[in-house]
Amino acid sequence: MDKLRVLYDEFVTISKDNLERETGLSASDVDMDFDLNIFMTLVPVLEKKVCAITPTIEDDKIVTMMKYCSYQSFLFWFLKSGAVVKSDNKLDDVEKEKFVATFRDMLLNVQTLISLNSMYTRLRQDTEDIVSDSKKIMEIVSHLRASTTENAAYQVLQQNNSFIISTLNKILSDENYLLKIIAVFDSKLISEKETLNEYKQLYTISSESLVYGIRCVSNLDISSVQLSNNKYVLFVKKMLPKIILFQNNDINAQQFANVISKIYTLIYRQLTSNVDVGCLLTDTIESAKTKISVEKIKQTGINNVQSLIKFISDNKKEYKTIISEEYLSKEDRIITILQDIVNEHDIKYDNKLLNMRDLIVTFRERYSYKF
């Protein structure tokens, strides 16, 4: 929104100077909210009349769009003269180029605002369903925790098989589902569009990214780890072929389930028997204790998921800094431990031993801004 405000100010400044000079009339007071509503109405019309608005749209298309935008619609020039935005194309070459770029960026940012408004409306509509799903999920988790045998836990999963499949299909077909779950617990997403935009950039996951990630995991070679065909794995193998994302993208559900089972087994072993992993976790916890105020957390009165998420949201900058510092101070140690595990178990991708340093550094450089 800040960027849009800057672009709007530039647009108005250039437009007012040119209009007042050409007509001898004085511009009225500026009302950004009013004018943005006009732009939000115009953008779909311009896309229908001219072409789709994209970052690569040509200058001549932008100039054509200017022809369909009358200054009379905007409050600062409301009903004063019949000038259109294209009239500013008479500026000298440098100013003209700047104005065209400003107008293009304005349209792109308004397009984003339209998308946010649409998501904002859907978030309000979908939260009731999300609340219902969340309660059911917590109920299933509670029953699983209360199960004393593997058979009892398997029965809980079987009894809720249809719900689990339908919920997974909803989650995997909606790139904003994670965002909607957060909105249930953090009301700022519903009341503040700035927060919604920030969270959208962080927590939106496209189907393409999911499919790519699933394929990468499926293609891992962890043949040294024995497959555990317990009832949980059998349940996952029966369930995954019914997931639409797997069906539509021809993903081998059995292969993915096998790899996930092996990864789970490997992680469990490392957490329970790897001395280096244990020392790393202990050092991290002890270090975090010196930076996190336990008293502050107690005073907040966190007693459920909603209050926990609200607390994290209210203090995310502080905890983001702590997590970042902790990770960066231990990155080399983490990479060494992970590479040792990879070497010991001969974990390969595309017939090559995984290089954990390359993998982690690449991930950090590409995606760390999201966290």
From Swiss-Prot:
GO CC term, one of those recorded: host cell cytoplasm
Keyword presence, Transferase: no
Signal peptide span: none
Keywords assigned by UniProt, alphabetized: Host cytoplasm, Virion
Role of this protein: Lipid-bound viral membrane assembly protein that plays an essential role in immature virion (IV) to mature virion (MV) transition. Functions in both crescent-shaped viral membranes formation and its enclosure to form immature virions. In addition, participates in targeting mature virion proteins to sites of virion assembly to ensure their correct localization.
Family: Belongs to the orthopoxvirus OPG132 family.
Domain notes: The N-terminal domain is not required for crescent formation but is required for virion formation.
Protein name per Swiss-Prot or TrEMBL: Virion morphogenesis protein OPG132
Organism phylogeny: Viruses, Varidnaviria, Bamfordvirae, Nucleocytoviricota, Pokkesviricetes
